[in-house]
Regions:
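Divalent metal-dependent hydrolysis catalytic cores, especially in the metallo-beta-lactamase
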Residues: 128-138
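Acidic/His- and Gly-rich active-site-bordering loop/insert found
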Residues: 1-101, 110-113, 117-126, 130
Length: 138
């Protein structure tokens, strides 16, 4: 399957993830629900991960099927929100008073989950890809 076709097929799913993440913004190093959400998706995709970095951070890994080389690359997304009220009116607006995803971290996290899912399904490469979900970036 051509990469762009599969990514296009995943678009609505990634959009749903972004909206779900948008509705549960958390700040600082206390992104417990967001971390739980990310870990549930990684588990759903059968991707191994370690958690607890800086409290709520996660590092996942997808190993390629073409050998056991030590080649690796890391992809990162931040997942914290900002301490500000959301004034938008749509179904996925913030459910956490005084917190909002106002700078795209919900989108960053959704895209990284999409990359992780895609590469776990299409692991015809050598080495490993690490997915770093970073809390408390703001």
């Amino acid at each position: 399957m051509i990469v762009s076709n599969r990514i296009n097929q995943m678009f609505e799913e990634m959009k749903t993830w972004r909206q779900e993440l948008h509705s549960i913004p958390e700040i600082g190093l206390e992104e417990y629900e967001t971390s739980k959400y990310i870990k549930s998706k990684l588990s759903e995709f059968n991707i191994e991960f370690k958690d607890g970095y800086a409290n709520t951070g996660i590092v996942a890994r997808v190993k390629g099927s073409q050998g056991e080389s030590d080649k690796s690359i890391g992809l990162r997304a931040d997942f914290d929100a900002l301490p500000m009220p959301e004034k938008n009116e749509f179904k996925h607006k913030s459910t956490n008073e005084g917190m909002m995803h106002a700078c795209g971290h919900d989108g960053h996290t959704s895209m990284l989950l999409g990359a992780a899912k895609y590469l776990s399904e299409n692991n015809d490469f050598d080495g490993s890809v690490y997915f770093i979900f970073q809390p408390g970036e703001e």
